[in-house]
């Protein structure tokens, strides 16, 4: 504190009036000896009387030593009720010094780690959480105690209660806490929210982490944990493009790049999820950027699969399954499969979505090369029924991926986009100007020829 002052619980900053350090140096060893002889209650009364004097005189160092000594003696004597009572009593004393309370709480936090008896540990945690509630100067200790309590609840099978307890903490506002520890707390909040399937809250909590933090040193483990949690979240949301970006972030991590098997699995997931993502400008841009990665050469099947979606040619689903099905779903000894198309409900859904992306790719190709096509012909090219083809086409039109108009009576699809009236008028005006310029030039050339012949 500035000028050697101490801060009281009411916020006032006071200077030390009397130095009791010599008295405390003399009394503490005497009290420790008496406590070991079993006269703990007598010792505590003596120390409480001395604490009043040091507190009134604003001697922060001596007050801290007395508070720590009281809880230490109670702990060593295993007088748990007395320990909890004195923590409450000392923290609530009138005009108590903040630094002294902080020292006492820090000492008690070490006891929480050492105590093995669960009911005693839980009671001490509850007492300390009660004492630290609403006090900024012990907010870090309160956060750590809350995390310990949440861990105990989770170990006892009460995951919902653990998530609820940990969510109370708004650690992103704790300026005194190190950034790394803050991120660890937020990741733990995300993990527990995912465990109880609270996806909306997980999404909100995830926004509290700035991903630029992961560019700092010694953050790779936290980075991988964060992106794995985000993958779980976005898999529930079905946001394939976001999952692809998360896997790219994992793929770009140095510790993943250092191990061939790990980066290959990450890159395979990147390729598969970008293919699974519905087509739009961002997806198309990402596909071409991923295609330029030289490391794709080491997983040729996945490189060829990605190339199919960048080539302006029709694909047959049956051929794709024949060529890539086994590699994507089962893998091989040299190239293990990812869990994207695993034999789970989610894996089957993604396999179905892959088929949908093949169909959508084919319809986009048709829209590029055809101006008009019959429904029957389109269904034949897509290996689908007419109704299924129409459903896919309608979906792409609604999403504004392509333009198409269907004449259902004639069974004809028109891919030609109608021109805007202003553009039509501009085209007409431009062509008319071009025609008049041509007529003018021709007239001029005729007149020139006539003049030359007249001269002759």
Curated annotation (Swiss-Prot):
N6-acetyllysine carried by residues: 221, 368
Family to which this protein belongs: Belongs to the proteasome subunit p55 family.
One Pfam family, short name: PCI
Crosslinked positions (Glycyl lysine isopeptide (Lys-Gly) (interchain with G-Cter in SUMO2)): 92
GO cellular component: cytoplasm; cytosol; extracellular exosome; extracellular region; ficolin-1-rich granule lumen; membrane; nucleoplasm; proteasome accessory complex
SMART domains, per database record: PINT
Disease entry from the Swiss-Prot or TrEMBL record: Stankiewicz-Isidor syndrome: A neurodevelopmental disorder characterized by delayed psychomotor development, intellectual disability, behavioral disorders, mild dysmorphism, ophthalmologic anomalies, feeding difficulties, deafness, and variable congenital malformations of the cardiac and/or urogenital systems.
List of residues that carry N-acetylalanine: 2
One Gene Ontology term from the biological process aspect of the record: proteasome-mediated ubiquitin-dependent protein catabolic process
Linked residues for Glycyl lysine isopeptide (Lys-Gly) (interchain with G-Cter in SUMO1): 92
InterPro entries named in the record: PCI_dom (IPR000717), PSMD12-CSN4-like_N (IPR054559), PSMD12/CSN4 (IPR040134), RPN5_C (IPR040896), WH-like_DNA-bd_sf (IPR036388), WH_DNA-bd_sf (IPR036390)
Highest taxon in the source lineage: Eukaryota
Keywords: Acetylation, Intellectual disability, Isopeptide bond, Proteasome, Ubl conjugation
Name of encoding gene: PSMD12
Organism: Homo sapiens (Human)
Subunit architecture: Component of the 19S proteasome regulatory particle complex. The 26S proteasome consists of a 20S core particle (CP) and two 19S regulatory subunits (RP). The regulatory particle is made of a lid composed of 9 subunits including PSMD12, a base containing 6 ATPases and few additional components. Interacts with ERCC6.
Residue ranges constituting the PCI domain according to the UniProt record: 242-420
Protein name: 26S proteasome non-ATPase regulatory subunit 12
Function: Component of the 26S proteasome, a multiprotein complex involved in the ATP-dependent degradation of ubiquitinated proteins. This complex plays a key role in the maintenance of protein homeostasis by removing misfolded or damaged proteins, which could impair cellular functions, and by removing proteins whose functions are no longer required. Therefore, the proteasome participates in numerous cellular processes, including cell cycle progression, apoptosis, or DNA damage repair.
